[in-house]
């Protein structure tokens, strides 16, 4: 069986599902904005002005998010998760939207593997007709209250474990399979398959691809800006953004 493994945030979705969920929780007065303002605002400002690191912003955001949703009842969380995918689920890259449809038409398995919360990943998987999915598990107690305990899926080590589980479940031929990712957390996913695609890759991911001769030789790099989609190889020239 041939599979196509897709990361979601920054690969399919043009933003972060966790970010959108966080904003909606604040909008519906389920979380205190002051915590976001105190812990995340400055990191976002630096990233937004392109003088800060996106990973630092996401790290601050994720930590704040995990702390903030502790104690939130599942019924409220599910309501907001539904709204996020209903209102934002179509904000995807044209290239990966096209490739999801292409893989389905070829009879390939489409599998979403994301570091976003499983309750968001499951909804995106359903919306885009994915065959299976895996996200970060946000645990609840017996009463359906979020505990703040997480089994993460945003790092390369855990994504590797998930792919091996999917391979056993579906008898996947990795040499013929595809993977799509945008950050260094996707590196093992790209290394495992015969057809890796880096979508608007971060500098860290791009440098990792360049330093791995085997991976560099088989990776297609896709850059989508405005209404143009570019396809380049790992030898693409980059320009230092610090002046």
Cite the ranges covered by each PLM segment.
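A residue-level signal for conserved active-site and pocket-lining positions in enzyme catalytic cores
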Residues: 10, 77, 133
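A metal-dependent, Asp-based hydrolase signature
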Residues: 17-18, 30-102
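C-terminal cap/substrate-recognition subdomain and adjoining C-terminal extension
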Residues: 1, 80, 86-243
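Active-site catalytic microenvironments for nucleophilic, acid-base chemistry
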Residues: 21-28, 127, 169
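Asp-based phosphoryl-transfer active-site loop
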Residues: 1-18, 190
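Catalytic cores of large soluble enzymes that bind and process phosphate-bearing ligands
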Residues: 13, 69, 155
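Non-catalytic pre-domain segments flanking phosphatase-related domains
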Residues: 1-8, 23-36, 240-243
